[in-house]
Amino acid sequence: MRKIFFPLLTIFLIAFSGIIQANQTVYGSKRDSNHVLLVYDSQNTVEQGEKKIDTLQRMLAGIGLKVTTIKESEYQKGELSHGYQGVITMINWEQAQLVNPGFIKDRDQYDGIKLHIGEGLDTTEQQQLQVKLKTIYQQQLILKDGNSTEMMPFVDRMDVLTGIPKEVQRYGELKTQDKDQQSYAYGIINRNQGYLPFFNNTGLGLITTGKMIATLFDRQQETKPLLTIANVTPYSNLKILDELSSYCENLGVPFAVSTTTVAKNTEMDAYKRFTRSLRRIEDRGGVIFLQAPVIGGATVNNASELSELFDNYLLNLAQNQVYPVGISAQGFWDQDQVLRNNALKKANYWMLFPNKKVVYLKQDNQGETSSRSYLALAASGFNKIKNQEGVRFAMPIALTFNMPDSKVRLKNLKEQIHALNFTWQNPAEDFNSKIDVASSLIAYQNGQYSVNGKVTEVKTVAEEKSLPKPVGTPALFKEFFKVQGRIITVFFAIIFLVLAIFIAFGRKIYKNMFKR
């Protein structure tokens, strides 16, 4: 009996291990190499933690990753088995702590890429990273990355890493300013796991973070920043805009402009002057990003209206030989199904700005990416970096300046551009953008614009282009403003009525005083 039992047991174990191995292979094959799960503890709006989440989402889009974002307390057990390439734990508020045992257990057992940002690195994570924690107090650290340095904000306390193995990759150094001048690693990567003690929204900290995350997810690249003039509108001072674009051309600095436009009254002289100014920008080597409008009281039902509005924007501009190369919007547009599918996805080049006023139509927190997604950052946030020439970006970055509205601010802007010691990206050299609008395709490659595959030359005097006529659509979200107007009218009418009654009573009381 034993002679038969042991051989059978051996065969069974071999077969069983083979089945497990096969299942693991299938599981691995289902893993999406472009999709990550971002889990945060709290938005911590008091300390602007929601801005850090927004920046990280836009950064991940910039390195070509789709990102699903959920709050840790809302994590459902088993979510990590849904084919993510990696999971990012973002701690915005240490006091909130991780409270979901389902997430902690899944993360501990997960064998994909793992990144921890912020405080609260638990014992299991320390063991997996092969490091130990040390707490330092009352410090203003200096971040050093290569030859570039920047002073970090003052911290009351912070956890830093010690006992880091030699084979671990380090990104940036944090140096104290005391006599001993201790040095600690800023970010580390140990095999498929990474750690960052904090997340910066700007400056050298953000640049170093970007390089580390890009390496962790195997998305290494070296890019030049794109100089961008933001918040241009048809109502901007066009003379100042023209002088600014001329200055950039004479300085030999390629640039982009992010501008809004209008869908109505496009036959008026004011619109013609506006598009003529944009054509000069194109003629001087600049490129145009169509900036998304501010959202009013819209709903999911406005999806088709939004799509038509963008088609009209693009067609009206193209009729006047202004050919946008991409679409710019606040980051939340990529976290909203309606805004993303009916606006952003018309272009393969995006420029995602920091969130200001967030208005969702159908929030899904399923951020996607495009052929190229620029992380837009205020250029002023990089002024404090010493040795800027040594800075290397790891993803498409747009360094933005607000459109100046006076001669004084124009002068200041020129000085800022001249002071920044960056090598700027030239769109004419490496852009390959496409925008689908109605039945037409607008493209830009090797410095040439084309419409439906036919190369077109931009002239300062526009020629009528044979494109589909824009469809007459009602102004986007006009009902929102109409309702607001009616409410205000009724409100003031009631106030005047009450005042009239008080005046009448007062007049009567005043007369009765003299009758006595």
Label each PLM-derived region with a short phrase.
Residues N34-H35, G83-Y84, G112-I113, Q130-Q140, ...:
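A glycine-centered loop/beta-turn motif at secondary-structure junctions
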Residues H35-S42, L115-E125, G252-N341, A347-N348, ...:
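Metal-dependent polysaccharide deacetylase catalytic core of the NodB/CE4 family, i.e.
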Residues P474-L497:
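Juxtamembrane/start-of-transmembrane alpha-helix segments at the extracytoplasmic/lumenal side
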Residues K224-Y235, Y374-K434:
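Catalytic grooves of carbohydrate-active enzymes
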Residues N200-G205, G210-R280:
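Active-site beta->alpha N-cap acidic-glycine motif
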Residues K345-F382, W424-N432:
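His/Asp/Glu-enriched short active-site or ligand-binding loop at hydrolase and phosphoryl-transfer sites
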Residues D41, S81-Q126, G285:
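Short alpha-beta junction capping motif
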